[in-house]
């Protein structure tokens, strides 16, 4: 059952029913309650760069849209099924990894303009399109620290060439998507909400927070249950 399509029984005496209360305001905030996946994909399609932190990323439709974006960098919660060396009796894990492998990030950490630019500056500057962070809940403890964010940031990327002929890129974030909506296969059938925010100070705050989460992230083939960042601040 899709809860977004549910209606109460009506005895016919009142001409009313459940409606979509989504709205667009003039102060840089849009509110969505229905068709969230469709709205999110629309924002993804317009971006040069999509970055963010989401607990889980398993929606085929969203992953297919992200595969068409020039640059993507998303941090997810550390889970056992993310590791390529973990055997799965079903093919969903290998399919998910192939979806992740289709995403690309040609930008270096130094071009993001947040704390990522200061992370292990003497090491390989590349960054994977999908990384993980947090603690692996091996014992399935209910109250366990997780990276439970659900936000994506949309940015323009400008190519700049200096007087020496060297090219670098300037990242300019312009919008944030956040709310209860998980980027998973079944979330579109649940009652969820999302905000799309373009107010510059709020966008910048999310951009800085993303940088901190990404700076403490690890590759998907993690080896330690507890958080084990690949980088440090400085060299």
Features from the language model and the residues they span:
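PLD/PLD-like phosphodiesterase catalytic module centered on the HKD motif
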Residues: 1-49, 56-235
């Amino acid at each position: 059952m899709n809860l977004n399509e549910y209606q109460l029984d009506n005895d016919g005496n009142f001409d009313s029913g459940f409606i979509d209360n989504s709205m667009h305001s003039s102060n840089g905030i849009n509110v969505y309650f229905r068709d969230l996946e469709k709205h999110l994909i629309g924002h993804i399609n317009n971006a040069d760069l999509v970055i963010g932190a989401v607990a889980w990323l398993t929606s085929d439709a969203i992953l297919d849209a992200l595969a068409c974006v020039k640059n993507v960098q998303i941090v997810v919660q550390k889970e056992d099924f993310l590791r390529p060396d973990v055997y799965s009796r079903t093919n969903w894990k290998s399919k998910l990894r192939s979806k992740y492998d289709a995403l690309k990030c040609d930008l270096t950490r130094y071009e993001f303009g947040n704390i990522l630019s200061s992370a292990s500056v003497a090491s390989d500057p590349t960054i994977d399109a999908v990384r993980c962070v947090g603690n692996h809940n091996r014992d399935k403890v209910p109250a366990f620290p997780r990276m439970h964010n659900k936000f994506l940031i949309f940015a323009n990327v400008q190519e700049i060439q200096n007087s020496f002929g060297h090219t670098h890129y300037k990242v300019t974030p312009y919008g944030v998507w956040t709310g209860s909506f998980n980027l998973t296969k079944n979330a579109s059938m649940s009652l969820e909400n999302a905000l799309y925010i373009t107010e510059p100070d709020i966008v910048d705050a999310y951009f800085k927070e993303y940088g901190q989460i990404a700076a403490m992230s690890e590759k998907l083939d993690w080896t330690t249950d507890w958080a084990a960042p690949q980088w440090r601040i400085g060299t």
